[in-house]
A protein has these predicted regions:
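Sec-dependent N-terminal signal peptides
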Residues: 3-16
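Soluble, non-membrane globular domain cores that form compact, hydrophobic packing
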Residues: 15-84, 89-195
Length: 195
């Protein structure tokens, strides 16, 4: 009986520790970007991530990064690109896996995807870098018209440096597709990922 009471008392501390690590990583990422971007923590107007927000996460943050200086995009317009950063934490890796299975049924762009399988075209999606690590999901959404391939690679590298590890899964989404699993992709034939 004492063990059960001890476990019940310990559970909130463990969950707090997991969310605290994600908060620290997010804070580090935002601090690295603070010289170039104006950063706002927002409650609404988050990009459409499919049904991810319907999953049972224990912690969620959303930030918008708007570039301070204007730049010329590939269409020749002077713009201040904006980027969206969303982070989600789950109770444990099993909860994350359950959430991913649910999310993949209606992924970004309302596309049903199979884990580990790439897709060439997905209409109405913005470029994004998704890092799935431990019990967290971190998503950085970029602009189709303000992002070139070099900038995309820089963002991917920065995201991996802060939110990733050698075991992190990385999903990259281009403007209107493709969706590519570029690091530690799951085996599409693995029965653990079957719906």
């Amino acid at each position: 009986m004492k063990n059960i009471i001890f476990l019940i008392a310990l559970t909130p501390l463990l969950l707090h520790g997991q969310t605290e690590e994600l908060k620290q990583r997010t804070s580090l990422f935002l601090q690295e970007q603070s010289e170039t971007f104006k950063i706002k923590e927002l409650n609404g107007s988050e990009p459409d991530y499919g049904i991810l927000k319907e999953t049972q996460f224990i912690f969620h943050q959303y930030y918008q990064l708007k570039q301070i200086d204007k730049e010329i995009n590939e269409l020749g317009n002077s713009v201040r690109p904006k980027y969206d950063l969303s982070t989600f934490a789950y109770e444990d890796e099993e909860e994350l896996k359950y959430a991913l299975k649910f999310w993949f049924k209606e992924f970004i762009g309302h596309k049903r995807i199979t884990p580990g399988r790439d897709y060439k075209t997905v209409y109405h999606v913005e470029p994004a870098v998704i890092i799935i690590e431990g019990n967290t999901i971190s998503i950085l959404t970029l602009s189709c018209y303000a992002t070139d391939i070099e900038e995309f690679r820089d963002w991917r590298s920065t995201m991996l440096g802060v939110f990733g590890s050698p075991n992190a899964m990385v999903v990259e989404i281009g403007c209107n597709g493709p969706i590519e699993w570029t690091k530690n992709s799951p085996d599409p034939k693995d029965p653990n990922w079957r719906r």
